[in-house]
């Protein structure tokens, strides 16, 4: 047994020595080839046409072109700071085109020896182009060339809209008339606007035609009356100076509120040739007179004039005021003042009597000059025909007071001079009566 064990040990020792002598020499070349493979096959630090293998990128340390500020929020308090990245003062601004090219060339020299494809990985190029757009007009003009085509529509949309003063198409027109006349210079600008030919022709039907009948607002239940509203009156409510919308016009015409009341009213107006756009805003302030149709407004003015003529206490007011000025030395002066005031009131009422503002279904020919007539027409349109008759009624009440004041002064003069001859009094009274007329 011991002999067999010693033989086995010797046999294994021989095999180990044989492997060491035979394989030891063979391992050295293999180790040499394995050790040399990563160094001999490494590419040089330059661009190679091999596109399958890209060496790892280890950028060398560099100094930033734009030094960061210590306080990242230092630019917030200063509204005139050009750039938060330019916190430190520099002799020259890096945002100009010439300097930018020199900086880009210097930046390429710092990355010399690297692959050409890696030069676009520098994130500072994007920041530099962004900074060029934030500075003055010169940098802005140079930076516009770097904008992409996709950003152009957004830049165009931000341009403020400038209206062409040559195109003057009033949006308050309520009558559908012929096509709008445009000049040659403006025809190209409006050629792209879609125009409905059906809305360009036609016009308002007979202005004297009755549009609807409206019950009065101010009448009592026992004497309720209805007023006829013509097409011309509806046109005046939709035209300046009021420019009523569908809601207010429906209130004037006493139309019941409904879900589609505005649309039905616009359709009804469209049938007679009047245009009432949706979403329209009123142009004048709403008063109590706005709710009255012209027939009721004129009726109110006529009743007001009747009350002023018959019920105004002109005589009592004249006697009361004359007693406050009973000094005989002031009577002559006061009488002349009353006569002059009466003459001025007469001139004023004569002017209002010549007013020919359109009212109801009548459109009389103007008598006054266009300047003063347009002002009176504006007043009557705002008041729905109540204005001028009401003013005339008030001035008539004033004239009645002046007449009663002159009569009272004559009585006071006769009472203060009882020795005067009756003939002289009669002659003076006749002259005064002629002057009053």
UniProtKB/Swiss-Prot annotation:
There is a cross-link at residue 10 (Glycyl lysine isopeptide (Lys-Gly) (interchain with G-Cter in SUMO)). One of its GO terms (biological process) is retina layer formation. It comes from the Eukaryota. InterPro entries: TF_AP2, TF_AP2_alpha_N, TF_AP2_C. Residues 65-74, 88-101 have a biased composition (Low complexity). Residues 280-410 are annotated as: H-S-H (helix-span-helix), dimerization. A motif (PPxY motif) lies at residues 57-62. Sumoylated on Lys-10; which inhibits transcriptional activity. Residues 14-107, 414-437 are annotated as: Disordered. Residues 428-437 have a biased composition (Basic and acidic residues). PANTHER family: TRANSCRIPTION FACTOR AP-2 (PTHR10812), TRANSCRIPTION FACTOR AP-2-ALPHA (PTHR10812:SF8). This is Transcription factor AP-2-alpha. It comes from Homo sapiens. The lineage of its organism: Eukaryota, Metazoa, Chordata, Craniata, Vertebrata.
């Amino acid at each position: 047994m011991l002999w067999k064990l010693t033989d086995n040990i010797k046999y294994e020792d021989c095999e180990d020595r044989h492997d060491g002598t035979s394989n030891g020499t063979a391992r050295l070349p293999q180790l040499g080839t394995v050790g040399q493979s990563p160094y001999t096959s490494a590419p040089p630090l330059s661009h190679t046409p091999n596109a399958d293998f890209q060496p790892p990128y280890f950028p060398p340390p560099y100094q930033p072109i734009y030094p960061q500020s210590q306080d990242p929020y230092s630019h917030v308090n200063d509204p005139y700071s050009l750039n938060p990245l330019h916190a430190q003062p520099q002799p020259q601004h890096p945002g100009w085109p010439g300097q930018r090219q020199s900086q880009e060339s210097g930046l390429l020299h710092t990355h010399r020896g690297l692959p050409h494809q890696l030069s676009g990985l520098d994130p500072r190029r994007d920041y530099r182009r962004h900074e060029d757009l934030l500075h003055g007009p010169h940098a802005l003009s140079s930076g516009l060339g770097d904008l992409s085509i996709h950003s152009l529509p957004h830049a165009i949309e931000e341009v403020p809209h400038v209206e062409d003063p040559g195109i003057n198409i009033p949006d308050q027109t309520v009558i559908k008339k012929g096509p709008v006349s445009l000049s040659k210079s403006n025809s190209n600008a409006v050629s792209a606007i879609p125009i409905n030919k059906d809305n360009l022709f036609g016009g308002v039907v007979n202005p004297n035609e009755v549009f609807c009948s409206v019950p009065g607002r101010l009448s009592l239940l026992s004497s309720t009356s209805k007023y006829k509203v013509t097409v011309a009156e509806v046109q005046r409510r939709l035209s300046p100076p009021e420019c009523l919308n569908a809601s207010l016009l429906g209130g004037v015409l006493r139309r019941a509120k409904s879900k589609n009341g505005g649309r039905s009213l616009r359709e009804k107006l469209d049938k007679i040739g009047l245009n009432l756009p949706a979403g329209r805003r009123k142009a004048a302030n709403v008063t109590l007179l706005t709710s009255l149709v012209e027939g009721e407004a004129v009726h109110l003015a006529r009743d007001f004039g009747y009350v002023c003529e018959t019920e105004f206490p002109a005589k009592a007011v004249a006697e009361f005021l004359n007693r406050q000025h009973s000094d005989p030395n002031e009577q002559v002066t006061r009488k002349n003042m009353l006569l002059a005031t009466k003459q001025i009131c007469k001139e004023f009422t004569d002017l209002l009597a010549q007013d020919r503002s359109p009212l109801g279904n009548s459109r009389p020919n103007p008598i006054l000059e266009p300047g003063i007539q347009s002002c009176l027409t504006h007043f009557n349109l705002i008041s729905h025909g109540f204005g001028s008759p009401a003013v005339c009624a008030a001035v008539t009440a004033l004239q009645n007071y002046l007449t009663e004041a002159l009569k009272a002064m004559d009585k006071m003069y006769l009472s203060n001079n009882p020795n005067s001859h009756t003939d002289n009094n009669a002659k003076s009274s006749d002259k005064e009566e002629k002057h009053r007329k």
